[in-house]
Swiss-Prot record:
Record PTM: N- and O-glycosylated.
Chain ranges on the Cytoplasmic side, renumbered to this chain: 1309-1363
Domain called EGF-like: residue spans: 67-105, 532-569, 939-976
Family assignment from sequence similarity: Belongs to the neurexin family.
SMART domains: 4.1m, EGF, LamG
Residues exposed to the Extracellular side: 1-1287
Pfam families tied to this protein: EGF, Laminin_G_2, Syndecan
Annotated segments matching region Disordered: 1244-1280, 1330-1363
Laminin G-like domain mapped to chain residues: 132-329, 336-528, 574-747, 761-936, 982-1180
UniProt topology in membrane: Single-pass type I membrane protein
Protein known as: Neurexin-1
Source species: Gallus gallus (Chicken)
Length: 1363
């Protein structure tokens, strides 16, 4: 029966059945027992489940204790005879002992019918010799049965064994489908019997432990002919063989052979302890010979008794002994397990000579998913075929683990087979027994008891292996090794980590522990144990490495960290690429792979660029990673057409990630296994794909980064890479670090090691009239632009391309801020780049501008990002040339309205990426204009802390720098020359400057500086007065030897004084005064700045906050109200005269005055040059000549410096006022703004760089300059020019009542026609031309949609004033 378990529903009856079971209505499973006669006689030694038991109930049975008494003595029955009591006497049953006699003490050595096997009397049992032999794996007995074949229906096999090995053949006879096989299998006793039509298999295992415990165990196998009820529709009884196997007399398994074959016939050999090829024996569950001791191996049947152990020792002519056998029990060296602790460890075994047949068996145990366990290959042979390229082929054999599954790989020259040995994963930490057997083209691979057959393709039956057989991995120096593409673990550098034991090759044991010691193999431990603690619990992976528990080790995935090493402790090398750089790995031999593991980290600001590619010199094969529109694109092309595949579908592509050109580190991983592809970026979900076609082999000679140099088979060349690469690992090889450390000598590179700022192909536009024209920008559906720039200019056109209809794109600098202007057909749009400060700081800045297919526009400047979505048209249809750096002079007038530029870009551009194209701005130019040079030297001299003397302000310019000496009292290029100096003698004198009646300024902020020396205790140095009747004034004076200032701007007198500095000591002193509204500062020489804040300023702050929330259309009304408030509280109205010397005030000054500066006017210079508006009277004398700082070379700079001043200096009062509330005071920065240009009342609030129009305002500020520190502040002199003379004002007031309606209509008309006037700013001259200015109060501006003027700077000044 095939069923091993029996279900029992009744008691166990001995000797017969009770009457109730004989009822005719009761159906029994075996109905014939009802008709059997009850047993009469003795039944002794009753055991159930191996234990003695007592009956529960009996009928007509006498329980006799006499047997226990008579059989109690140990010497009643010897040699295992069974004692029973008959007629009150002890009787021995010797039938199962091989002995005879009353007490089973006489050896039964007569065998009927086989006279040659008759043996003499061996004496009594006590003197009986035991026949023992020791087998060490290569020895065995072979008894020839050819002269006396066995034909039996009942037989018995007995033997005893002692071993430490888990597997081994103990006995075998028969061949083909008629055999008996007894073996030790994984520590259990295995019996396989086949009588011609099917095998009976039994496996006896101990309850605890294994039989390979180095103790003696007795095995007995019996086979008897019995009648057995058939199962099925026939329901007939047949004669079957009952088979019983017992170990140590208590472990018994019973079953029946299949069908009705009852005879065992054998004319072959009896093998004991092994065979010449155990793996090839029919039915053999093991492939190796026995290692240990065998005792008293006996086979007997009705006709013959073969004492095989005795015959071997006595040298029977039919018994052949192979090997040197010791006929005694010796200790056999155990095959100790070993542990491969690292993927790099391995053992080299001798060449496996298994051309026709062979077998390998071993046990393994691991928790790791991947590893090469066994590998060997034959001599390389070149395969040439008209349809195939020349390639190297080898015979090979491999057993590997991939993803937890065990695979057999074999190629005998006619094609490769790859067999998954087991469907379940085998990396669960348990022991698995692997047995590989082959005979020609066919064979099996079995794991534990599950066997998988195979048949190799083609006709070749010879496995020609010529190299060593490697166990556990491969040597680091793989020169001379040929790795077939099908052996993925070899190409992926996956060494095996785990335990191996009991390695047998062709039935011969291999002491791999001893081999490891001889080879001094690192990372091999002569034991196997599994640690219970999980290694990752201690967080061994540093720098955010991802930990995985391996076999008694932790495994760190460092691919996303930028570090290398077992614990991610070593920083990985960075390579910097500038678009002309590369690293190329030229492999020593052509590689063919079917599986790849690729990982790398990159950082780039470009949306396009090649990251890594494998290339071939002979095919289009490639595995390529590149940036494509900010995403990672994987392309795999296996050149199926070239090798004549039938189902080529072209390259496979996968995309992953988004906006990866953000100048941050990103990690890319690629895993290919045959046709399966997986692409991962950072921690995002993996993208997967399946390759079409039957071809899976990738050929490559090179691994390239930065630039693809092998372009012969490329239909299109990817853009060069600009950025940084790190941790490039291809199939376990960290190539960047291998190249840097000199570990490999096949690197070629010009990329630079280390993290470096990338400035690729810089070009200098030396003048604002310089520009280049390139081919039309291709940005129809989407766009990715990138460039770097460096400049000191506030304004300039960087990029311009026009197109069909109104389509265009512009990138420009406006007041130091970047603007992106475009029109896709729905009207022009402006996006202002975000930056903390103006970008004209002579530093490199990175700019990325993109537009995706959903019309999401992104502007990124360094790390600041601005986005905006637009509706409507989605395509940018450009047609004409692309201009870089500017356009022709006559084209500025026709630029779109939102474009501010009136001149070109002066400075450097680099790393220009035009939607994936890297143009050479000079070589690729259709034409060039002006001075354009390669490289970027920048200003030959730059502003340093000590560039300008005496607290002069350094102004960086592209061709150098200049010094603003306005507030120093000195002059000259570096503010270290004396300023214009007058001496006021005894009796006093005075220099008076008078503004023209129609040009008297009103200011919110004033700046005054002068140098002097005197010994007076009382004197007036400078006084500024307003027009008659207004009463506003400002006076710089000496009182009791201390310098001070008094001023009145419409309310009360305000005074500020430096009380600590003695200034009437005859030494030269410089005094600086600033005013912003009612706030004021005063500084003498290098003494700390004195600050003064009148009460009520919080009102202005609250008004400034409220002003930002005032509706757009009400802006003008509020502006006028705020202006009126300003006239009362903060504005120095209608300034008329500047009087120097104080003669009129009764305290004439005596001493020296130098370098007077007031709101852009250098009055002493003007006096020395005989200015018509200056009157000199009294004892005043010019010292020397006018300083010659106004040379021809520096006229423009000097004028600009004299007419302008630091932006933030004018707001020192404001800044320091907030400092008293806990904010840091503001230094005087580098910057400039024109002083004497008209500015409007408080304008609509906006961002600093905003140039959007608001409600009608007055003209603009020429040459606005930003401070290096951030927000824009009021200029040195915010001037409100009087629109008419005082007489005109009187007439206007008188006529106001009569002309009220007319004035209102006129104002409305002017508001609705804001584009009547325009102005042009010339930075080098500081003047306003083409100004449509009547004799009114303000200069009108163009309407909002026209090109904007720079008056926005003045708007911000008003806003900053209120803050």
């Amino acid at each position: 029966s095939k069923r091993r378990d029996m279900t029992v529903f009744s008691g166990l009856f001995l000797g017969g059945l009770p009457p109730e079971l004989r009822s005719a209505t009761l159906k029994l499973t075996l109905s014939s027992v009802k008709d059997r006669e009850p047993f009469k006689g003795w039944i002794t030694d009753v055991r159930v489940n191996y234990t003695q038991t007592s009956p529960v109930e009996s009928q007509e049975v006498r329980l006799d204790d006499e047997q226990s008494r008579l059989c109690a003595r140990e010497d009643v029955c010897l040699n295992g005879g069974v004692c029973s009591v008959l007629n009150d006497q002890a009787v021995c049953d010797c039938s199962q002992t091989g002995f005879r006699g009353k007490d089973c003490s006489e050896e039964d050595n007569y065998v009927e019918g086989l006279a040659h096997l008759m043996m003499g009397d061996q004496g009594k049992s006590k003197g009986k010799e035991e026949y023992i032999a020791t087998f060490k794996g290569s020895e065995y007995f072979c008894y020839d049965l050819s002269q006396n074949p066995i034909q039996s229906s009942s037989d018995e096999i007995t033997l005893s064994f002692k071993t430490l090995q888990r597997n081994g053949l103990m006995l075998h006879t028969g061949k083909s489908a008629d055999y008996v096989n007894l073996a030790l299998k994984n520590g259990a006793v295995s019996l396989v019997i086949n009588l011609g039509s099917g095998a009976f298999e039994a496996l006896v295992e101990p309850v605890n432990g294994k039989f390979n415990d180095n103790a003696w165990h007795d095995v007995k196998v019996t086979r008897n002919l019995r009648q057995h009820s058939g199962i099925g529709h026939a329901m007939v009884n047949k004669l079957h063989c009952s088979v019983t196997i017992s170990v140590d007399g208590i472990l018994t398994t019973t079953g029946y052979t299949q069908e009705d074959y009852t005879m065992l016939g054998s004319d072959d050999f009896f093998y004991v302890g092994g065979s010449p090829s155990t793996a090839d024996l029919p039915g053999s569950p093991v492939s190796n010979n026995f290692m240990g001791c065998l005792k008293e191996v006996v086979y007997k049947n009705n006709d013959v008794r073969l004492e095989l152990s005795r015959l071997a020792k006595q040298g029977d002519p039919k018994m052949k002994i192979h090997g040197v056998v010791a006929f005694k029990c010796e200790n056999v060296a155990t095959l100790d397990p070993i542990t491969f602790e690292t993927p790099e460890s391995f053992i080299s075994l001798p060449k496996w000579n298994a051309k026709k047949t062979g077998s390998i068996s071993f046990d393994f145990r691991t928790t790791e998913p991947n590893g090469l366990i066994l590998f060997s290959h034959g001599k390389p042979r070149h395969q040439k075929d008209a349809k195939h390229p020349q390639m190297v082929k080898v015979d090979f054999f491999a057993i590997e683990m991939l993803d937890g599954h065990l695979y057999l790989l074999l190629d005998m020259g006619s094609g490769t087979i790859k067999i998954k040995a087991l469907q379940k994963k085998v990396n669960d930490g348990e022991w698995y027994h692997v047995d590989f057997q082959r005979d020609g083209r066919s064979g099996t691979i079995s794991v534990n008891t599950l066997r998988t057959p195979y048949t190799a393709p083609g006709e070749s039956e010879i496995l020609d292996l010529d190299d060593d057989l490697y166990l556990g991995g491969l040597p680091e120096n793989k020169a001379g090794l040929v790795f077939p593409t099908e052996v993925w673990t070899a190409l992926l550098n996956y060494g095996y980590v785990g335990c191996i034991r009991d390695l047998f090759i062709d039935g011969q044991s291999k002491d791999i522990r001893q081999m490891a010691e001889i080879q001094s193999t690192a990372g091999v431990k002569p034991s196997c144990s599994r640690e219970t603690a999980k290694p990752c619990l201690s967080n061994p992976c540093k720098n955010n490495g991802v930990c995985r528990d391996g076999w008694n080790r932790y495994v760190c995935d460092c691919s996303g960290t930028g570090y290398l090493g077992r614990s991610c402790e070593r920083e990985a090398t960075i390579l910097s690429y500038d678009g002309s750089m590369f690293m190329k790995i030229q492999l020593p031999v052509v590689m063919h792979t079917e599986a790849e593991d690729v990982s790398l980290r990159f950082r780039s600001q470009r949306a396009y660029g090649i990251l890594m590619a494998t290339t071939s010199r002979e095919s289009a094969d490639t595995l390529r990673l590149e940036l494509d529109a900010g995403r990672v694109k994987l392309t795999v092309n296996l050149d199926c057409i070239r090798i004549n595949c039938n189902s080529s579908k072209g390259p496979e592509t996968l995309f992953a990630g988004y906006n990866l050109n953000d100048n941050e580190w990103h990690t890319v991983r690629v895993v290919r296994r045959g046709k399966s592809l997986k692409l991962m970026v950072d921690d995002q979900q993996a993208m997967t794909g399946q390759m079409a076609g039957d071809h899976t082999r990738l050929e490559f000679h090179n691994i390239e980064t930065g630039i693809i140099t092998e372009r012969r088979y490329l239909s299109s060349v990817p853009s060069n890479f600009i950025g940084h690469l790190q941790s490039l690992t291809f199939n376990g090889m960290a190539y960047i670090d291998l190249c840097k450390n000199g570990d490999i000598d096949y690197c070629e590179l010009n990329a630079r090691f280390g993290f470096r700022n990338i400035i690729a192909d810089p070009v200098t536009f030396k003048t604002k009239a310089s520009y280049v024209a390139l081919a039309t920008l291709q940005a129809y559906t989407s766009m990715h632009l990138f460039f770097q720039f460096k400049t000191t200019s506030l304004d300039g056109l960087i990029l311009y391309n026009s197109g069909d209809g109104n389509d265009f794109i512009v990138v420009e600098l406006v007041k130091g801020y970047l603007h992106y202007v475009f029109d896709l057909g729905n009207g022009a749009n402006l996006i202002k780049g975000s930056s903390n400060k103006p970008l004209n700081d002579n530093q490199w800045h990175n700019v990325m501008i993109s537009r995706d297919t959903n019309n999401l526009h992104t502007v990124k400047i360094d790390t600041k990002i601005t986005t905006q979505s637009t509706a409507g048209a989605r395509n940018l249809d450009l047609k004409s040339d692309l201009y870089i750096g500017g356009v022709a002079k006559e084209m500025y007038k026709s630029l779109p309205k939102l474009v501010h530029a009136k001149e070109g870009f002066q400075g450097c551009l680099a790393s220009v990426d035009l939607n994936g194209r890297l143009p050479d701005l000079i070589s690729d130019a259709l034409f060039c204009n002006g001075q354009i040079e390669r490289g970027c030297e920048g200003p030959s001299t730059t502003c340093q802390e000590d560039s300008c003397a005496n607290q002069g302000v350094c102004l960086q310019q592209w061709d150098g720098f200049s010094c603003d000496c306005s507030m120093t009292s000195f002059s000259g290029p570096l503010c270290n020359d004396p300023g214009t100096t007058y001496i006021f003698s005894k009796g006093g004198g005075q220099i008076t400057y008078t503004w023209p009646p129609n040009d008297r300024p009103s200011t919110r902020a004033d700046r005054l500086a002068i140098g002097f020396s005197t010994v007076q205790k009382e004197a007036v140095l400078v006084r500024v007065d307003s027009s008659t009747g207004l009463g506003d004034y400002l006076e710089l004076h000496i009182h009791q030897g201390k310098i001070g200032v008094k001023f009145n701007v419409g309310t009360d007198d305000i005074a500020i004084e430096e009380i600590n500095a003695i200034i009437n000591d005859g030494k030269y002193h410089v005094v600086r005064f600033t005013r912003s509204g009612g706030n004021a500062t005063l500084q003498v020489d290098n003494w700390p700045v004195i600050e003064r804040y009148p009460a009520g300023n919080n009102d202005n702050e609250r008004l400034a906050i409220a002003r930002q929330r005032i509706p757009y259309r009400l802006g003008r009304v509020v502006d006028e109200w705020l202006l009126d408030k300003g006239r009362q509280l903060t504005i120095f109205n209608s300034q008329a005269t500047i009087k120097i010397g104080g003669k009129e005030r009764g305290h004439p000054f005596q001493g020296q005055l130098s370098g007077l500066y007031y709101n852009g006017l250098k009055v002493l210079n003007m006096a020395a040059e005989n200015d018509a508006n200056i009157v000199i009277e009294g004892n005043v004398r010019l010292v020397g000549e006018v300083p010659s700082s106004m040379t021809t070379e520096s006229t423009a700079t000097a004028m600009q410096s004299e007419m302008s001043t630091s932006v933030m200096e004018t707001t020192t009062t404001l800044a320091t006022s907030t400092a008293r509330r806990g904010k840091a005071p503001t230094k005087e920065p580098i910057g400039q703004t024109t002083d004497d240009i008209l500015v409007a009342s408080a304008e609509c609030p906006s961002d600093d760089e905003d140039i959007d129009p608001c409600e009608p305002s007055s003209g603009g500020l020429a040459n606005p300059t930003r401070a290096g520190g951030g927000r824009e502040y009021p200029g040195s002199s915010e001037v409100i020019r009087e629109s008419s003379s005082t007489t005109g004002m009187v007439v206007g007031i008188v006529a106001a009542a009569a002309l009220c309606i007319l004035i209102l209509l006129y104002a409305m008309y002017k508001y609705r026609n804001r584009d009547e006037g325009s102005y042009h700013v010339d930075e080098s001259r500081n003047y306003i031309s083409n100004s449509a200015q009547s004799n009114g109060a303000v200069i009108k501006e163009k309407q909002p949609n026209s090109a904007k003027s720079s008056n926005k700077n003045k708007k911000n000044k008003d806003k900053e004033y209120y803050v």
